[in-house]
UniProtKB/Swiss-Prot annotation:
Subcellular location: Cell inner membrane
Organism: Phenylobacterium zucineum (strain HLK1)
Family annotation (InterPro entries): ATP_synth_OSCP/delta_N_sf, ATPase_OSCP/dsu
Keyword Transport annotated: yes
Protein name, entry field: ATP synthase subunit delta
One Pfam family in the UniProt entry: OSCP
Length: 184
């Protein structure tokens, strides 16, 4: 648990530094687009996840790998240099947290709020629209929703907005029931 907090803290600091630099250079939307593209690549590629997380690969290997991705995807020089710095400092494993924190900062700057939604099954367009409307009413800001499917939830939904987590998943309800039965 402490590792998650430490990693998240590191991710937030690096994200803030990148956001400040991108703001100075008026490149926040372009850098955000680069990072969203990289986030999708991380989600799609097991090899990339292994490269980032595995201690078997040195900082130089990680830097070269991220640089090759940045070149192929035609990332902005700001993004490419940042990825190189992250790898050189041995923080490549924190990249997913950096991306999430950067997205939150960019959303806040636009007056929106970033919401990470996890469901057991993909949301239909009507469900996504209803969820966006409910979040807009509850939060008072326009939500920028990122969806993820996790069959382990069994049913229901989890919504993470900033540091708040709204968990209405069947998995958490069953876990609560199991805990209550063990206590009785």
């Amino acid at each position: 648990m402490a590792d998650d907090s430490k990693s998240s803290n590191v991710g937030s600091r690096y994200a803030q530094a990148l956001f400040d630099l991108a703001s100075e250079q008026k490149e926040v939307p372009a850098v955000e687009a680069d990072l969203k593209s990289l986030k999708a690549a991380i989600a799609d590629s097991r090899d990339l996840r292994v490269l980032l997380a595995s201690p078997a690969f040195g900082a130089d290997d990680k830097r070269k790998g991220l640089s090759a991705i940045a070149d192929k995807a035609k990332f902005k020089p700001t993004t490419k240099k940042f990825l190189g710095l992250l790898a050189a400092n041995g923080r490549a494993a924190a990249l997913p947290e950096v991306i999430s924190a950067f997205e939150r900062l960019a959303a806040e700057a636009r007056g929106a709020v970033s919401a990470e939604v996890t469901t057991a099954l993909p949301l239909s367009s009507a469900q996504a629209k209803g969820l966006a409307q409910a979040l807009r009413q509850a939060l008072g800001k326009d939500p920028e929703i990122t969806t993820r499917v996790d069959p382990a939830l069994l049913g229901g939904i989890k919504v993470k907005v900033g540091s708040r987590l709204f968990d209405a998943s069947l998995r958490s309800k069953l876990d609560s029931l199991k805990f209550a039965l063990k206590r009785a």
